[in-house]
Amino acid sequence: LMGGWSNEREISLISGESVFNSLVASKLDVIKLDLNKDNIGKIKGLNPDRIFIVLHGKGGEDGEIQLHLENLGIPYTGSGSESSKVCMNKKTKKKILLENNIRTPSYIKISKSTNIKDIENSFHYPFVVKPTSEGSSIGVYVVEDRMSCKVAINENMKISNDVIVEEYIAGKEYTVGIVNNNALPVIKLIPPGKFYD
């Protein structure tokens, strides 16, 4: 499954084509489906042995397609619907981390009517402005001053009504993949810009 209806549709199509070509090269019988809200019902009729999910963002990484496939009884790659839902929503994820005494940068939810002075009373520059449920760093801004804060808020409100401001933590960035509850080696990320996309 590739494409979808999120802000990351185009990158999903590129990723999906790459995965499709790799699976075909591995001599597997593969069908690709450029998924949209109008053809989601087509999945069941394909009668797949397994679905390789290459959807990004809303609908693809937030548990929506995973729950649909679970309801159809079709196995798929990646995390389950509940963990996908939790991990995609930054507020929900932070709540669970804090409930389990795992440190996470402090944050507040904001709206169009939030006064920037209230944000500045809670955070020192730089800080982060981002939507709660987008992937690939869509809408993520590290703001250095009031003007860049206004821009970040305005741009985020165009794509989401659910936006947070978060404490900026300077430092090195690492990632650890997990497959079947087994942690893979730690990888240091060296982004070309201020943070990894």
Model regions and ranges:
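ATP-binding N-terminal substructure of ATP-dependent carboxylate-amine bond-forming enzymes
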Residues: 1-88, 92, 99, 111-118
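Phosphate-binding site of ATP-dependent enzymes
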Residues: 144-197
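Basic phosphate/pyrophosphate-binding loop/patch that engages nucleotide-derived ligands
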Residues: 96-104, 155-158
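Structural detector of well-ordered beta-strand residues that form the stable sheet scaffold
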Residues: 77, 105, 128, 164-166, ...
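Short, glycine/acidic-enriched loop or turn micro-motifs at the edges of active sites
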Residues: 37, 109-112, 133, 170
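ATP-grasp fold ATP-binding core
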Residues: 97-98, 122-138, 160-171
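Glycine-rich phosphate-binding loop of ATP-grasp-fold ATP-dependent ligases
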Residues: 12, 106-107, 127-154, 173
